[in-house]
Amino acid sequence: SEMCIRDRDYTDKQVLVTTDLLLEGIHFDLMYVPLKHLGYKSAVVNFSDIYAMNGRPKQITVSLGISKRFCVEDLEEFYEGIKLACDIYDVDLVGGDTSASRTGLAISITCLGEGEKGKVVYRNGAKETDLICVSGDLGAAYMGLQLLEREKSIFNGEKDFTPDFSGKEYLLERQLKPEARKD
């Protein structure tokens, strides 16, 4: 979700809050998404929501539903990605929760940020005459996903198949390790 809400006002800042829920088999496929990349991406999509409101992400909480097939090393790899994202974007991981899951991995991340009063941008403030600008490129992440899905379907039919992504690294990176646009 790209939904952000405004919490309460204080001083010259507004508190911004956003939450995303990512479910295995719906939002990601662990057959081709490394856990470190998943941790990174899970955090960055939340940071992006705050940046989209002209805010700055400050803190996150991470809550996980974990099935029995995951070991401690898997979780360490996932949190390496979270930590990398937090370090790059100067965001603090301040808490979270864990629970057992019968159906795979569930990830819920809440990001708290702040924006200057009067400069926070809301979706409902858009008007017909507004200019919409895009930073980055459109469709590269989707093309990366299509490549991964194509190679997965071939692999499922031929177990000795080795995917070849040469020349497609940029598309894969847009899918597996996207960056929040803060410019």
Indicate residue ranges for each PLM-predicted region.
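Helix-biased detector of long, well-ordered alpha-helical tracts
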Residues: 1-2, 6-183
